[in-house]
C-alpha cells in the first residue's frame, strides 16, 4: 500500500545508517572519550583501569535482560534522531559466554526494534588479562570456540577485529578473519 505525501516546500532526508555502534553495554564510557580528545591512546586508557577490559567486567555482572532493556532505550534514542539502520558490535564480553550473551541481545533487538539491525561479532576487541602473556591462546579461543558457536546459532552478520598497537596484530587479525570466512 503506497501513500502519497505532499512534501511541497519541505525538506526530506533519508534516514541515517550508523555503521559502527556499541549499543549493548553495562556502563557508559564518556570520561574515556574526553581522555581520547586530550590525546590519550586506548592503550593508555586501559593501563589506567578503564577501557574495554573494564567494560567487559561490568558486562559480565549484568543480566541479559538488563542489557536488552538499556540497549533498547539507546535504540529508541537513535531512532528519534533519524537513524534507520544500525550495525551493533559485541566486544565487551571477551569470553565465549558473554560474547554470546551480547549477540543474543543484539538478535533480540533485531527482532523487536523498528530499524534495520546488523550484528557484528567483535570477540577480538581486547585481550583479556588472563591472556596478556599469551595472546595467541585467546586468538585460538576466538577461532576454535567463539566463531563456531556464533555461526552455529546464527548470531552475527559480520565479524570484526580491533587491530591496533597493544591489541590485535595484523597476523592475529588475518587468522581470525580467515577463520570467520570459513563459516560464511
Per-region residue spans from a language model:
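Glycine-centered loop/turn motif at secondary-structure junctions
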Residues: 41, 49, 82, 181-184
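Metal-associated gating/positioning segment near the N- to mid-region
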Residues: 2-69
